């Protein structure tokens, strides 16, 4: 395998959503391949037809592409090693199964599900690890079943599976790129089913054959596949193939260090997409679930290009990685703070257009959807929002007149002297031809000073009148962005609508 071009793969089953653990596996395979100037491949493992979900394959690939993980070869992109869907490769698996049967490395098994369960329960009662009892192992392979009985069953068309014959008393060993040397005793290995009664291969059989035929050099996958390694290595040995290098990634854990599961929170990438997390933040976050740049590095925000240049399996740990959503949210904030304004503007326009289809704005649509106006909103709000969609939802007062006013703020700030003061100040603003933040601030201070009042007497009521809430960015800059016409209309409307709270 020395000198061979690096080839890695992500091989999901089309059974539904893309798990965040699956995204990490795909990402690490992608980063490793790209770092080594190799190829990253997507193969769909749909041998379990009972669990197959319609369109799951397309959704999986589109989610990966949204994350910036683009395959060099896949069912959608094609390639020289196809088909890339296992259900389209059945004749290949049957041919290799026949070869194993002929070489006495596999055998037919006609045991019924009831017999298998009975045997399993018996072994459990005896305190044994359940394994197939080799009832149908032929006499010429060390078993007790006459060849005539096997032939009779085949001639009758009885349903069967094909099992691998695990050698007795051998040690199966390999060097994991993350965990080091690992050894298995064949006495602990079951005679794995290779071909099911429906004519489809099991994951173990199809995966080994495809990994060899597609010439993958490195198999990077979750540690949950470690128990399957001896079966896979034996199959490589049966066929006389050199196995690829293997790396088994650490488990993903909840904050309480239990295994990450849907019972304790969202585990689908699509869940986080719907909440508004960006692909950059999710990829950055997932990359750090097991990998770190090394001692002395304090960098936590990485672009895809940086991840490719810095990623190595040597820096992937063995211990479980804690999935902390707070860290993901922190990363999202960092990206919003540094993302180019024009990119954010382009991203939030569809969100705003959807809102405009529901609600009518008081200002012209042309103005509030213009790049110039949206850029001002972004610059003013980017320190205050957690997700891009909040530039529209959390900051809706930049686009729509408030329909209500925060009750607690009104009770505290809307005193009896506020309406006449606001009316008087609004008249002054109307005559202001220089409607900038600096000018508005100077005008307000000059207005309240002779009255012996502090600016806060008007600052808070103006914010309530204009935005409907008691919090937000710099008031003066907010007024400048909204513009004189909208500000005056909202102040005067609030004077009419808000009742002075009873003393």
Curated annotation (Swiss-Prot):
Keyword list (alphabetical) reads: Aminoacyl-tRNA synthetase, ATP-binding, Cytoplasm, Ligase, Nucleotide-binding, Protein biosynthesis
Asked if Transit peptide is a keyword of the record, the answer is no
Keyword set includes rRNA processing: no
MF terms from GO for this chain are: ATP binding; glutamate-tRNA ligase activity; tRNA binding; zinc ion binding
Q: Where in the cell is it found?
A: Cytoplasm
Q: What class of enzyme is it?
A: ligase
Q: Which residues bind ATP?
A: 262
A GO term (biological process) for this protein?
glutamyl-tRNA aminoacylation
Q: Which reaction does it catalyse?
A: tRNA(Glu) + L-glutamate + ATP = L-glutamyl-tRNA(Glu) + AMP + diphosphate
Q: Which InterPro entries match?
A: aa-tRNA-synth_I_cd-bd, aa-tRNA-synth_I_codon-bd_sub2, aa-tRNA-synth_I_CS, aa_tRNA-synth_I_cd-bd_sf, Glu-tRNA-ligase_bac/mito, Glu/Gln-tRNA-synth, Glu/Gln-tRNA-synth_Ib_cat-dom, GluQ/Sye
Q: Please state the Enzyme Commission number of this protein.
A: 6.1.1.17
Short sequence motif named 'KMSKS' region, residue ranges: 259-263
> Which Pfam families does the record match to this protein?
Anticodon_2 (PF19269), tRNA-synt_1c (PF00749)
Query: Motif 'HIGH' region: where?
Result: 12-22
List, alphabetically, the GO terms of the cellular component aspect. Answer: cytoplasm
Q: Tell me where on the tree of life, at the top rank, the source sits.
A: Bacteria
Q: How does it assemble?
A: Monomer.
The record's similarity note reads:
Belongs to the class-I aminoacyl-tRNA synthetase family. Glutamate--tRNA ligase type 1 subfamily.
Q: What does this protein do?
A: Catalyzes the attachment of glutamate to tRNA(Glu) in a two-step reaction: glutamate is first activated by ATP to form Glu-AMP and then transferred to the acceptor end of tRNA(Glu).
Write the protein's name.
Answer: Glutamate--tRNA ligase
Origin species, per record, is Chlorobaculum tepidum (strain ATCC 49652 / DSM 12025 / NBRC 103806 / TLS)
**Taxonomic lineage:** Bacteria, Pseudomonadati, Chlorobiota, Chlorobiia, Chlorobiales
- The gene from which this protein is expressed is gltX
């Amino acid at each position: 395998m020395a000198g061979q071009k690096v080839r890695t793969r992500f091989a999901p089953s089309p059974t539904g959503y893309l798990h965040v653990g699956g995204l990490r596996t795909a990402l690490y395979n992608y980063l490793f391949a790209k770092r080594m100037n190799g190829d990253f491949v997507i193969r769909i493992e749909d041998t379990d037809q009972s669990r197959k979900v319609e369109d799951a394959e397309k959704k999986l690939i589109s989610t990966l592409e949204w994350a910036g993980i683009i395959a060099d070869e896949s069912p959608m992109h094609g390639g020289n090693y196809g088909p890339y869907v296992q259900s389209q490769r059945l004749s290949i698996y049957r041919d290799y199964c026949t070869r194993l049967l002929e070489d006495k490395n596999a055998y037919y098994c006609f045991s019924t599900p009831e017999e298998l369960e009975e045997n399993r329960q018996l072994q459990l009662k005896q305190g044994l690890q359940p394994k197939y009892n080799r009832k149908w192992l032929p006499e010429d392979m060390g078993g007790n079943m006459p060849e005539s009985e096997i032939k009779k069953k085949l001639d009758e068309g009885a349903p069967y599976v094909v099992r691998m014959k695990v050698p007795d008393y051998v040690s199966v060993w390999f060097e994991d790129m993350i965990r080091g040397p690992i050894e298995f005793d064949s006495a602990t290995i079951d005679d794995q089913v290779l071909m099911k009664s429906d004519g489809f291969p099991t994951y173990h059989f199809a995966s080994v054959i495809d990994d060899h035929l597609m010439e993958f050099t490195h198999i990077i996958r979750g540690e949950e596949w470690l128990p399957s390694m001896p079966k896979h290595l034996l199959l490589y040995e049966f066929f006389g193939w050199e196995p690829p290098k293997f790396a088994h990634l650490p488990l993903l854990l909840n904050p309480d260090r239990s295994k990450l599961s849907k019972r304790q929170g969202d585990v689908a990438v699509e869940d986080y997409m719907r909440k508004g997390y960006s692909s950059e933040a999710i990829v950055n976050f997932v990359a750090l679930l097991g990998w770190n740049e090394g001692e002395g590095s304090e960098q936590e925000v990485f672009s895809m290009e940086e991840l490719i240049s810095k990623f190595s399996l040597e820096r992937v740990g063995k211990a479980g990685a804690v999935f902390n959503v707070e860290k993901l949210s922190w990363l999202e904030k960092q990206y919003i703070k540094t993302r180019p304004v024009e990119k954010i503007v382009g991203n939030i326009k569809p969100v705003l257009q959807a809102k405009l289809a529901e609600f009518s704005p008081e200002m012209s649509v042309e103005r509030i959807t213009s790049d110039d106006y949206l850029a001002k909103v972004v610059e003013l709000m980017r320190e205050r929002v957690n997700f891009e969609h909040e530039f529209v939802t959390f900051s809706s007062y930049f686009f729509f007149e408030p329909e209500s006013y925060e009750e607690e703020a009104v009770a505290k700030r809307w005193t009896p002297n506020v309406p006449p003061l606001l009316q008087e100040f609004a008249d002054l603003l109307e005559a202001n031809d220089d409607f900038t933040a600096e000018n508005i601030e100077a005008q307000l201070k000059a207005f309240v000073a002779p009255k012996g009042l502090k600016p806060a007497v008007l600052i808070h009521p103006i914010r309530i009148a204009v935005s409907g809430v008691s919090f937000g960015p710099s008031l003066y800059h907010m007024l400048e962005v909204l513009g004189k016409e909208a500000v005056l209309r909202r102040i005067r409307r609030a004077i009419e609508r808000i009742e002075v709270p009873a003393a």
